[in-house]
């Protein structure tokens, strides 16, 4: 899902609320205890949403209404401060599953830009940035000298975790600590590595205690594997184009879709990536992948786009949030493509201004 809109239109706010609701659903699905009551009393749902995603009281009013329809439960919340109503669906017991979630914030480059950020970033309570720093320490573990990860950016860089230190290695072997890398590499490194790690977890054992595993095996009546192993991956990414040259933006989008496809193939449940963007290049690349998907679905031969970057056309969607905060579906089903008209309000002004100035110059 691609979300576009002007600054402060509510793109990231929507994505944060969606991510939090997905996380609450995951927690309830996986838990061996009945924890629904924990999130329907003492204003806990709204308190944790505000705390984790750093949303203050100004984001909520008496007219606020949140309605979440998930895979196996629904969440309803209304007003400024109150309790959520959480309802399990009829098929909850047999259909619940484990999923791996990750919110990749715009501030991700702090991982590289600040030395020892895990020690210097102080938060009174666990928030989205603190959590990302914590998850980064887990995610980078597998990418050692023996298993470097090729980054989706121009320049031929690979990421290597050298005894905990983040290092970028060029094709010729030259090493650069991430702290001294360009802003583009500092932005793409944690996003690309994290996306690869999270999607690679699908089909593998989930992080559960032995007690939790035993309890799940006792109660799940043949469905225990769906909670013991990750069945899907869900990524929420703010501005994947951040600090990147257009060619690198293309490589990043294709890398994300490539990772998503692997997760879709390995999992029994639907994996997804949600991104917010201001980039026409990101939109254009998504449209190329959409066109390639339709060609594949019609069984027509093509060699334009690698098959490992092609997912179902039905998996691709896009929305524009207008100045009133209303979502507009930007999928044009006739062509089909995601319309970028609302993203590019400058081109008409440029063309008109150049035309008028040329008239003055060459009159």
Model-derived segments and spans:
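Phosphate-binding glycine-rich loops of NTP-binding sites
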Residues: 2-46, 183-198, 254-255, 272, ...
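Loop/turn-to-beta-strand initiation segments
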Residues: 232, 269-274
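Helical segment within the ABC ATPase nucleotide-binding domain
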Residues: 224, 250-266
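Phosphate-coordinating catalytic segments in nucleotide- and nucleic-acid-processing enzymes
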Residues: 22-237, 307-313, 317, 324-363
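Conserved Walker B
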Residues: 240-242
């Amino acid at each position: 899902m691609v979300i576009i809109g002007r600054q402060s239109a509510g793109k990231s706010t929507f994505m944060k609320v969606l991510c939090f609701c997905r996380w609450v659903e995951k927690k309830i699905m996986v838990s061996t205890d009945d924890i629904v009551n924990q999130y329907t009393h003492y204003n806990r749902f709204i308190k944790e949403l505000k705390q984790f995603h750093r949303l203050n009281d100004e984001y909520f009013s008496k007219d606020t209404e949140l309605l979440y329809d998930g895979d196996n439960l629904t969440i309803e919340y209304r007003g400024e401060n109150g309790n959520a109503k959480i309802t399990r669906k009829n098929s909850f017991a047999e259909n619940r599953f484990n999923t791996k979630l990750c919110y990749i914030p715009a501030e991700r480059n702090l991982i590289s830009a600040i030395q020892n950020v895990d020690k210097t970033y102080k938060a009174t309570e666990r928030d989205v940035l603190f959590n990302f720093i914590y998850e980064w320490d887990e995610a980078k573990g597998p990418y050692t000298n023996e298993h470097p990860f090729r980054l989706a950016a121009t320049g031929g860089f690979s990421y290597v975790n050298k005894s905990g230190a983040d290092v970028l290695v060029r094709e010729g072997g030259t090493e650069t600590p991430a702290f001294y890398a360009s802003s583009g590499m500092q932005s793409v490194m944690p996003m690309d590595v994290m996306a690869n790690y999270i999607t690679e977890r699908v089909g593998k054992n989930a992080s559960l205690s032995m007690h939790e595993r035993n309890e799940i095996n006792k109660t799940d009546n043949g469905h225990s594997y769906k909670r013991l192993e990750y069945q899907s991956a869900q990524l929420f990414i703010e501005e994947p184009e951040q600090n990147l040259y257009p060619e690198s933006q293309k490589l990043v989008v294709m890398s994300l879709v490539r990772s998503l496809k692997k997760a879709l193939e390995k999992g029994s449940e639907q994996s997804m990536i949600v991104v917010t963007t201001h980039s026409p290049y990101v939109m254009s690349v998504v449209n190329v992948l959409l066109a390639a998907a339709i060609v594949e679905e019609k069984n027509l031969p093509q060699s334009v786009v690698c098959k490992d970057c092609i997912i179902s056309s039905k998996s691709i969607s896009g929305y524009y949030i207008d100045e009133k905060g209303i979502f507009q579906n930007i999928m044009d089903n006739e062509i089909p493509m995601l319309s970028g008209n609302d993203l590019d309000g400058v081109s008409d002004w440029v063309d008109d201004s150049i035309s008028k100035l040329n008239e003055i110059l060459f009159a």
